[in-house]
Amino acid sequence: MRIIVINPNTSESMTDHLRRELASISGSGVELVCVNPDHGPVSIESAFDEALAIPPTLDLVRGAERDGFDAVVLACFSDPGLEAARELVSIPVVGIGESALHLAAQLGRRFTVLTTIPQRVP
């Protein structure tokens, strides 16, 4: 199985960190490829940053299906472009934020999301 992990910001160092961490847990028969867009915000810290990140992220999602990947993981807790990506391709697209919230809801009645970014506090 080939899974592309898209870091929606342009931080190569963060993408390299993802690559190293995922390589240490990747199972047999699973190829994990980590990429990030070549343009867009370096960090996604606001709704504006998220809006800028979506178009190049969707380009990568479209390319992933074209290149034969079996699934896409969006590696940003705000899941930028998740719904649009699912409309765009026929392969599964999973966001780490949505996945974490679903798991938290299954494990307990109450949970919270912590952030150090003031722009993300409702």
How should each PLM-predicted stretch be described?
Residues 54-109, 113:
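Glycine/small-residue-rich loop that forms an oxyanion/phosphate-binding "nest" at active or ligand-binding sites
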Residues 1-58, 116-122:
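N-terminal glycine-rich anion-binding loop in soluble enzyme alpha/beta folds
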